[in-house]
Amino acid sequence: GGTTDYAVAIYFEAVRHRRYCSYLREDTALAMMYMPDALRAAVELMEADPQRLRHRNAYNVTAMTLTPRSIAAAIRRRIAGFVLDVAVDPRRQAIADSWPDSLDDSAARREWGWRPQFDLETMTGDMLANLSKTDPTQKDSRCLVTSWEND
């Protein structure tokens, strides 16, 4: 699995077992975005006024900086007794430690009005509501993606 897979798996495991074992330290912070915001960002950029776009080929977009601990706390506010265990995978931890914990998306905010609609609380509510309605053994179409940076 990938380094950021935990950010989706934690929700599936919360619904299935009320417990998740993180392979990253619980304080490992990474910039992330919920898929509905990522899709909306792409559409908004395509529909933006070209006269306002100065960085035509590269924009950072981000929504939130998350840790396994912060996601677990948000889940715990909705699922009493949820437990976060930690068993660090040194390889994935080293990768996560090499990534930025935040991105500067001020150009997107300034030039085409980018604003995420989901924060940790609204994303957690949406994820848990959707997973509770579906078979949690099946992958949901909404997922969390790591915010990206284009060169």
Features from the language model and the residues they span:
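C-terminal substrate-binding subdomain of Rossmann-fold SDR/epimerase-dehydratase oxidoreductases
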Residues: 23-25, 31-151
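NAD(P)-dependent short-chain dehydrogenase/reductase
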Residues: 1-29, 35-37
